[in-house]
Amino acid sequence: MSREKYYLTTPIFYPNGKPHIGHAYTVIATDALARFQRLDGKDVFFLTGTDEHGLKMQQTAEKEGITPQALADRNSAIFRSMTEAVGGSNDEYIRTTEPRHYASCQAIWKAMAANGDIYLDRYSGWYSVRQEAYFDESETTLGEDGVRREPLGSPVEWNEEESYFFRLSAYQDKLLALYESQPDFVGPAERRNEVMSFVKSGLKDLSISRTTFKWGVPVPGDDKHVMYVWVDALTNYITAAGYPDTKSDQWRYWPATHIIGKDIVRFHAVYWPAFLMSAGIELPKRVFAHGFLFNRGEKMSKSVGNVVDPFALIEHYGLDQVRYFFLREVPFGQDGSYSHDAIVNRTNADLANGLGNLAQRSLSMIAKNCGGVVPKRGEMTDADSAILDQAVAALTTARKAMAGQGIHLALAAIFDVVAEADRYFAGQAPWALKKTDPERMETVLWTTAELVRRVAVLCQPFIPGSAAKLLDLLAVPADKRDFVHVHADYALVPGTALPAPEGVFPRYVEQPGANA
C-alpha cells in the first residue's frame, strides 16, 4: 500500500550574508513538522535551499572582488552547514544556480507567456536594493536626513527600465475565490486577513524581469533580461518536485505545504498561486507564515547588527535545548522573543528538571533494585493505566495541532503528560514501596519507564538526539520508534536488559559572563 505523500518546504534563503537565528528557527520548525509526519507513516519530502541570484548577490560579489557564483558557492555551503547544525532532516537542498532550476524557470515562464499573461513594457518606481522590490511613492517616507525609505526601513532610489510584466491584475477575482473556498490556504488567520485585504485593494501587474543586472536566469528569447527574483526563487519548489517533467515519480509529491516568514507572505500567497494558475499547475496545499524572533524584544536584522549566530547558540546551550526552547516557547505563527534567561529557565524546568529527572530517577532505581532489567509488571491500578493513557491521548492532540502547524500546542500536550507523570511518581513513592511492597514498586517503576518510552517516542520530532538517547536507555529497537509504537501493544517487555542509566539533559549551570 502506498503511503500518503507529504511535501514540506522552507523558503530558500538568500546567501549574501551569514545565517542568523531567524533562518535557523525556520529550519528547526519545518524539520519538526517533517519529522512528525515521517514518524506518523507519511512519505515525506522536505526541501530547503538557497536563492542565489539577484542584484544584492552581484553587488556583494563585486565588493569582495569575486564572481557571484563563487559567492553563492561559498555562502550556500555555510547555509547548508547551518541546516545540518540545527538537526535538519531535509531530503534535498536546492540551489537556484543549478541547471535543472534554469530549465524549470524557463518552462514556467513559457507556460505563463503561452497563456497570454506576460508582456513587455517600461517600469519606473522607487526601488529598494535590499528588498529587491519596487514601491509606490505612497508606501515610502522621506526622512529628516533626506533619504526616502520603504516600510521596512531600507533606502529607495528612483529607477526606470524596460521590463516584462505578469498580468497579476487578471487574477484578483480568482485569488479571492481561492481564499474563500479554501480558508486554510493561508495561515495563521491574521496573515490570511492581511492577504485578502491586500488583494481586495486592487492588484497591479507585476514587473518580473530586470535589465539592470545580469546575475539571474535569462528570459527565454530575450537574453538582455533576467528573471526577477520572485519568479526565479518561487519556482524552486516545483524544480525540486521534478518540473517540468510532470510524469516523473518525484512530481507525485507536489503540491507542497510552504513554511515561510511573515515578511514574504505576499509573494507566496498572492504572486505564487497566480503564477501557478497561469501556468496550469496545481496550487500549494497551504502557505503558513511564522512570526519574527526578537532578541530581548528587538527584531533581528543583519543590518542592525544584533543577529545571534545559530552555531554559537547551539554550541553554548546544546542543540536540543535550542530546538526545544524555540518550538515550545514561541507560539508558531506569532512573534517571539528570546534571551539567555528565557532559554535557561525553560530548558532547565522542562528538560533537566522535568523529563530528564523523571527518566534518571526511575532508571536509576531500576538499575539498583531490579537487576538492570525492565521490571515485572504486576496488577495495574487505575492511576497506572491513567498516566499511560494520557500519553496516547497526547498523540491524538499533537496530531491535530501539527496538522495546523501548532507546534507549540503539540509540545504543550506532551509535556503536560511529563508534569502529570512527575506527580504520579512522587505520589506512588517507589523508594518507600521498596520496603513495604516490592512487587508494587516494580509495577510503578515499569509504568514510569513505559511512560518515558511513550513520551520519548513523541518527543522525537522536536528533540531528536535526546529522544533517541532516552529510547536507547530503554533498549527500544530502532524499528520500534514510530508513532504507531506508542500504543500498549509495543510496551516494554519485563526482563529486557537495560544499559546503565545516564543523564540525558544536563542542567544548565550559570557561568560568570555567560549571557548570550
UniProtKB/Swiss-Prot annotation:
Main location: cytoplasm
One GO term of the biological process aspect: methionyl-tRNA aminoacylation
GO molecular function: ATP binding; methionine-tRNA ligase activity
Gene Ontology CC: one annotated term: cytoplasm
Keywords of this entry: Aminoacyl-tRNA synthetase, ATP-binding, Cytoplasm, Ligase, Nucleotide-binding, Protein biosynthesis
Protein EC: 6.1.1.10
Subcellular location(s) of the protein: Cytoplasm
Motif ('HIGH' region): 13-23
UniProt-listed InterPro entries: aa-tRNA-synth_I_CS, Anticodon_Met, Met-tRNA_synth, Met-tRNA_synth_2, Methionyl/Leucyl_tRNA_Synth, MetRS_core, Rossmann-like_a/b/a_fold, tRNAsynth_Ia_anticodon-bd
Enzyme class: ligase
Record function comment: Is required not only for elongation of protein synthesis but also for the initiation of all mRNA translation through initiator tRNA(fMet) aminoacylation.
Recorded family membership: Belongs to the class-I aminoacyl-tRNA synthetase family. MetG type 2B subfamily.
Record-linked HAMAP family: Met_tRNA_synth_type2 (MF_01228)
Name assigned to this protein: Methionine--tRNA ligase
Organism whose genome encodes this protein: Mesorhizobium japonicum (strain LMG 29417 / CECT 9101 / MAFF 303099)
